[in-house]
Swiss-Prot record:
GO terms for cellular component: mitochondrion; nucleus. It comes from Xenopus laevis. Residues 602-611, 795-797 are annotated as: Interaction with target DNA. Residues 1-403 are annotated as: Disordered. The gene is lig1. Its EC number is 6.5.1.1. GO terms for biological process: cell division; DNA biosynthetic process; DNA recombination; DNA repair; lagging strand elongation; Okazaki fragment processing involved in mitotic DNA replication. This is DNA ligase 1. Residues 184-195 have a biased composition (Basic residues).
Length: 1070
């Protein structure tokens, strides 16, 4: 039994006593032969854990593991015995099997005399507490060298954490003693002392050793008796040692990690390489040990301490492999040479080693990396590099752990946060914050909006947006269309009628629910900042969440906005709020600001549609799309001069703008642009009936003299400017008829009466066409035009022809398309003639605009007066031949308008009192952006609201008004104010100031209360298009325009005079 235990702790000892030289030779041979034999005999199942100690093939029985534990515990107890007679039981709990194997060479163990081993009785060892070993000072370690016997006894007791009772057997103290080769053993054990302390867990240190360790010892003894020593010799390889080091941890860690480590250990390739390294290391280290013994000792001593705990974190056996191979080779040389100089060299190194381990304790809890990955990294390093690498790599496991909880996401987030499309020399791929094929993050869109909002220069904003779009084209071309719609704050073509329909109150409620704030605070902050978007951003940034929601993507946000717009029904509002809440919760940084603004209907970043078109053109020019992903050309304008580059881009932008004018549908243009490029757009995108155009608009003039000066000698014509609603009538080849407004809204269901007339008034030659007309309210029997206010009383959607009360007459004045041919490039004279040749005029239903082709000033003046008498707004003056094309979506100087409110002597100004104001938004944030005006009623002695006003002010005017009126704010309106809840202002004022205001005309209003009941029962009068002129400091509020004056001004309007006679006749026959 004694012999079996000795051999168990000394795997290289044979059954017979041999000489020193023979033992060394046998050890070398075993190291070379055993790996091949042992690999196939070690099934993965047996090597997984120590519970299989009973099997003869179990890795727990392997001498490598046993010897490693014996040697490491041996060195630990050396320190303990030098300070106190250590208790082997507690020492066993803290010992590391790995370190023992590395530090004890076979030769050293064989030379140790049994007497030396028996010097320290087991009882003395049992009395040593755990703390004694941890507190062992460097001096104690030095003295411990002389106590080789006691140290060897304790080391042998630590066969493994599985066999603690073997400590009590005196026969187990046959481990190497005071021989020269024993010194390095003790030194190496001290080096790795901190590591052993870290690896021992409380669960292993006490109760389990009494039961489980004894069984392991007995089983190993049986194995020794059966002659399994040779199979255990490969334990000297670094790989086997790493396996032993993992033993005490395997019980505490995840089984998956344990299995991964064991599977790596079973790899025969890895084991063979390790053994070769060990043998070669022994041969090469021999001359080095003779010439430079101290450096050879230094590297192994420093390394274990530097990597203490760190190698364990990584779960990597390689650092230990390098250490072990070096140490074993060095010890073998020691045993042959018996050098006393090396003993003295080890002492100062032990001192240095003892001071290092404390720093590494804190890293015990860091997770471990896979073993093989680290092994490959460090396999080619020398000893010193291994030491440095182990120190440098210690924080890396922490990095991996952090990334497990989202560190890598955080890095990506930081990259997106720093995205700057306005930087100079922007690269579409390198400077983008997403990768090829990935969805465009909405944060990139928000960052682009931020840069545009901060910059006032239009050209710079065009460049910024084009840079962003270049990245989209290069990396994610399928997201180009959603990104463009987000920049325009639209959900699709205007004629599709997709509107969000989210009011400010609903938005505030959604923000409050999403951020957990009180609705009252949201409202108060919104009034203070003047921008609900900023409130949403600040509210979201102050909110903390337990789990980070998925990041918003541009296409995803666009899809959610479309879903909101399509929802209808009684429960739709709650569903919309839920979607909005989901968007706000996932917002980062400025995303909430622009989502709130998008939902509110205005981005307020100063980005007009023409700027967006210019940006698209510039992006496509510089980074032309293609089938390659990403495109091969990143900057097509590289090498051009600044002027050439500018003119080239402007030329391409004009192609896009003209194409968009004829086909204002991004859904149709963008796919063709990506597939065929910008040069081929006109071939594929043409004017198409069913897709509304943006109409041509006219410039206002101050008088007839300006008209004559503008057109000079060019022929022009004058037409009535009808006071109605612009109507673009599309007749399709299949016979369908659509009516669109000037804003491209589909009004087909609003005018079923017009639809029914078209087949009757068009000639058979007309297969398809597009007409530009004005829908005007009129009385066909009286042949009179009614004011625009009458037209507004019609139902806006889904009108039933049988329920129509306000009849409409269509006044056609232009034709843009006829039978498959676009006429926009034709002169106006030709278009007008084609119009008259293609349709039949019907009184009160379909009429051609009244015109006069004369250029005499007097005749024009008379014609203007006649237009006003005929209840029109004034005249439209147009060129006939020269520069007479139809300029889609342009306010052209080739069309001029003469309106009555622009001429002197027509209309009158009103003096009105300011009684309320609305807080400004956007550029007017911090001051008042609009005001509520009222007239004074002398009979009732009250102020009656007449209009809201927000135009005609300069920035100085607004500042002046704010500074004056803020001192006259009252909490509630005066009892003598007559107003409607629909016009309630943010601040009420005392009536202290009178303003002079001009307007286009006056109209009947159900909301405003001026002249209430004087013109129409239960209705008042309001101003259309009021403009601020000046402050009337010479008038008191009571001297302002009164209700009777307002009613009189309304009656004096020419078109009202025309309708008043009709109304009297109707009243007469009523």
């Amino acid at each position: 039994m004694q012999r079996t235990i000795k051999s168990f702790f000394q795997p290289k000892l044979g059954a017979e006593v041999k000489t020193k030289e023979e033992k060394v030779k046998n050890d070398v041979q075993k190291e070379k032969e055993e790996p091949e034999k042992s690999v196939p005999e070690r099934p993965l199942k047996e090597r997984n854990g120590r519970a299989l100690c009973g099997d003869t093939e179990s890795p727990v029985k392997r001498v490598s593991k046993k010897s490693a534990r014996v040697l490491e515990s041996d060195s630990e107890e050396e320190e303990e015995n030098s300070k106190v007679q250590a208790t082997p039981e507690k020492m066993n709990n803290e010992s590391d099997p790995k370190n023992d194997v590395k530090e004890t060479p076979p030769s050293a163990r064989k030379e140790t005399p049994p007497s030396a081993r028996k010097e320290t009785p087991p009882s003395a060892r049992k009395e040593t507490p755990q703390s004694a070993r941890k507190e062992t000072p460097p001096s104690a370690r030095k003295d411990a060298k002389s106590e080789g016997a006691s140290e060897m006894n304790t080391s042998q007791d630590f066969v493994s954490p599985c066999s603690s009772k073997s400590i009590d057997s005196p026969l187990c103290s046959d481990s190497p003693g005071i021989s020269p080769s024993g010194i390095p053993k003790r030194k190496t054990a001290r080096k790795q002392l901190p590591k052993r302390k870290l690896e021992i867990s409380p669960s292993e240190s006490n109760p389990p050793k009494d039961d489980f360790d004894v069984k392991g010892a007995v089983k190993r003894q049986k194995k020794e008796a059966e002659g399994d020593i040779q199979q255990e010799e490969p334990m000297e390889t670094s790989h086997n040692i790493s396996m032993e080091e993992e033993c005490p941890i395997k019980k505490e860690t995840n089984p998956d990690v344990v299995q991964e480590t064991i599977s790596n250990a079973d790899d025969p390739n890895i084991e063979l390489v390790d053994q070769k390294d060990v043998v070669s290391g022994e041969k090469q280290s021999e001359p080095k040990c003779q010439e430079q013994p101290q450096p050879k000792l230094t590297s192994p001593t420093v390394e274990p301490k530097a990597s203490k705990g760190k190698a364990r974190k990584k779960n990597s056996p390689l650092p230990k492999k390098v250490k072990f191979s070096d140490k074993v080779s060095f010890k073998d040389n020691d045993s042959e040479e018996k050098s006393n100089e090396e003993k003295s060299d080890e002492e100062p190194q032990k001192k240095a080693d003892s001071a290092k381990p404390v720093k590494q304790i804190s890293s015990f809890f860091a997770p471990r990396k896979p073993a093989i990955k680290t092994e490959k990294r460090e396999e080619n390093l020398n000893e010193k590099n291994v030491t440095e690498t182990s120190l440098e790599e210690s924080p890396k496991p922490k990095k991996n752990v952090g990334s497990f909880f989202g560190a890598s996401k955080q890095e990506a987030t930081e990259e997106q946060t720093e995205y700057n499309p306005s930087k100079s020399k922007y690269h579409p791929i390198d400077d983008a914050c997403w990768c090829n094929g990935q969805k465009v993050p909405y944060l990139a869109v928000a960052r682009t909006f931020e840069r545009i909002e901060e910059e006032s220069a239009r050209l710079k904003n065009v460049e910024t947006l084009s840079n962003f779009l270049r990245s989209v084209i290069a990396l994610t071309p399928e997201d180009l269309l959603p990104c463009i719609y987000l920049c325009l704050n639209r959900l699709g073509p205007a004629y599709e009628g997709l509107e969000l329909g989210i009011g400010e109150t609903i938005l505030m409620k959604a923000v409050a629910q999403a951020t957990g704030r009180q609705l009252e605070k949201i409202k108060a902050e919104a009034q203070e900042k003047g921008d609900l978007g900023l409130v949403a951003e600040s509210s979201r940034s102050n909110q903390r969440t337990m789990f980070t929601p998925p990041k918003l993507m541009a296409s995803g946000v666009f899809g959610k906005l479309k879903d909101i717009a399509r929802m209808t029904g009684n429960a739709s509002m709650n569903k919309k709020i839920d979607i909005i809440k989901g968007l706000f919760v996932a917002c980062r940084h400025s995303e909430a600001r622009y989502i709130a603004r998008s939902l509110g209907g205005k981005l307020r970043i100063g980005l007009a549609e023409q700027s967006v078109l210019s940006s698209i053109a510039q992006a496509v020019c510089l980074t032309p799309p293609g089938r390659d992903a990403p495109p091969t050309v990143m900057d097509a304008g590289k090498g051009m001069s600044a002027d050439a580059r500018k003119s080239w881009i402007e030329e391409k932008a004009m192609i896009l703008k003209q194409t968009f004018c004829e086909l204002p549908n991004y859904d149709a243009i963008i796919p063709i642009l990506l597939e065929h490029g910008i040069d081929d757009l006109p071939k594929h995108c043409r004017l198409t009936p069913g897709i509304p155009l943006k109409p041509m608009l006219a410039h206002p003039t101050k008088g007839i003299g300006e008209v004559l000066k503008r057109f000079d000698e060019a022929a022009f014509t004058c037409e009535y400017k009808y006071d109605g609603e612009r109507a673009q009538i599309h007749i399709l080849e299949n016979g369908e008829v659509h009516v669109y407004s000037r804003n491209q809204e589909n009004n087909t269901t609003k005018y079923p009466d017009i639809i029914s007339r078209i087949p009757k008034i068009k000639k058979e030659s007309v297969k398809s066409c597009i007409l530009d007309t004005e829908a005007v309210a009129g009385d066909a029997e009286k042949k009179q035009i009614q004011p625009f206010q009458v037209l507004t009383t019609r139902k806006r959607k889904d009108v039933d022809a049988s329920e129509i009360k306000v009849q409409v007459c269509v006044y056609a004045f232009d034709m843009l398309y006829l039978n498959g041919e676009s006429l926009v490039k034709e002169p106006f004279a030709k278009r007008r003639q084609l119009l008259r040749d293609s349709f039949l005029e019907t009184e009160g239903q379909f009429m051609f605009a009244t015109y006069m082709d004369k250029s005499n000033t007097d005749e024009i003046s008379e014609f203007l007066d006649q237009s006003i008498k005929d209840s029109c707004e004034g005249l439209m003056v147009k060129t006939l031949e020269q520069d007479a094309t139809y300029e889609i979506a342009k306010r052209s100087h080739n069309w001029l308008k003469l309106k009555k409110d622009y001429l002197e002597g027509v209309g009158d100004t009103l003096d009105l009192v300011v009684i309320g104001a609305y807080l400004g938004k956007g550029k007017r944030t911090g001051i008042y952006g609009g005001f509520l005006l009222a007239s004074y009623d002398e009979e009732s002695e009250e102020y009656q609201t007449i209009c809201k006003i927000g135009t005609g002010f300069t920035d100085d005017d607004l500042e002046k008004h704010y500074n004056f009126l803020k001192d006259h704010v009252i909490e509630n309106p005066r009892s003598y104010y007559r107003w409607d809840s629909a016009t309630e202002p943010d601040h009420w004022f005392d009536p202290v100031q009178v303003w002079e205001v001009k307007c286009a005309d006056l109209s009947i209003s159900p909301v405003h209360k001026a002249a209430l009941g004087l013109v129409e029962d239960q209705k008042g009068i309001s101003l259309r298009f009021p403009r601020f002129l000046r402050i009337r400091d010479d008038k008191k509020p009571e001297e302002s325009t009164n209700s009777f004056q307002v009613a009189d001004l309304y009656r004096k309007q020419q078109q009202i005079q025309n309708t008043s006679s009709t109304e009297k006749a109707e009243e007469d026959f009523y």
